[in-house]
Amino acid sequence: MAKKTQKDFLNPKELIKHIDIKKYSQAVSMVEDFSNMAYSSRDLARASKIYNMMLADKGCAVVLCLAGSLISAGLKKIVVDLLENNMIDAIVSTGANIVDQDFFEALGYKHYKGDQHNADDNLLRDLHIDRIYDTYINEDELKVCDETVHKILNTLEPRPYSSREIIWEMGKWLEAKKKGKDSIIYTAYKKGVPIFVPAFADCSAGFGFVAHQTERPTSHVTLDGAKDFLELTKIKINAKETGLLMFAGGVPKNFVQDTVVAAEILGQDSPMHKYAVQVTVADERDGALSGSTLKEASSWGKVSTALEQMVYAECTLAVPLITAYAYHKKAWKSRKGFNYIKFLQNDDAKIAKMKKQECCCCESKKSASKKAKKK
């Protein structure tokens, strides 16, 4: 029997393809019919309508939350279409979706259909093939992704950065290299939509950071997670209303919900998130946040209960329906994006100016002190 190679598993004819919601105008009538059914179908219909309400509310900033491995599963184009059509204003995600999967594909690499039932994971390991349930990835290509992040970090001024700033630099790099025009990172960069990855070191970017900081131990780029939280809180305070569109749970879900509490700590009267939709298969009974209900979040003062909906379904089934419904209802057509990248960059510029003024003031005091001593 011939020894198997990478080519036996990474078949160019068996690629994961990203679904195009623009093709499915019939999703509107289907989802509306779901309203007259029961169980998860009715929940999904209500969730779809709540998302459409977010888009129709001109003062509402929509934050998309992504957890798990959704981009490798074929949902990338949905997120890109939401960005292109001003249907989301900020993204909070796991690093896997943004770096290991979206940036990975922006470099020209692909995800392949696999076999979760008959996979020999020891053989896959020997062949440098990584498995995400029923999907395969070339590990050697993933290492190129790690190294590319490393190279980008080497070009930056050594200082603390929010993940949003690093991802913006990655978008800038893609533009310069003329790569990834169909990627989330590049599209968000082009549209002025910030992407936050609170656990940024927990992905390919983390390997890039390890290499960068080892190579430059005394002067390097660092991650400022508190700045991520502050920037997202500033968006919450700036927005008249906010809506959360959460696909899966995890850190992104809690991170954005907590901005209401953070705003309160800063003495700002910022209302609870007015709209909230979550698609998840997680169970609430273990006390973990991924499965905690949105009603539970209301007890913490984070989410209003009037317009919230949990949908207990796997994301690759529910997300195309919810987003296709909203896309073909066309409330987004009269909606303008908030360009929160510009908002945050302007804020950074003000802070930099304040620092410069403080520095000049300190230098003047030192100079005056030296003159006094000479006298």
UniProtKB/Swiss-Prot annotation:
Keywords: Transferase. Belongs to the deoxyhypusine synthase family. PANTHER family: DEOXYHYPUSINE SYNTHASE, DEOXYHYPUSINE SYNTHASE-LIKE PROTEIN. Pfam families: DS (PF01916). Its EC number is 2.5.-.-. The keyword Iron does not apply. The keyword Aminoacyl-tRNA synthetase does not apply. This is Deoxyhypusine synthase-like protein. One of its GO terms (cellular component) is cytoplasm. GO terms for molecular function: deoxyhypusine synthase activity. It comes from Elusimicrobium minutum (strain Pei191).
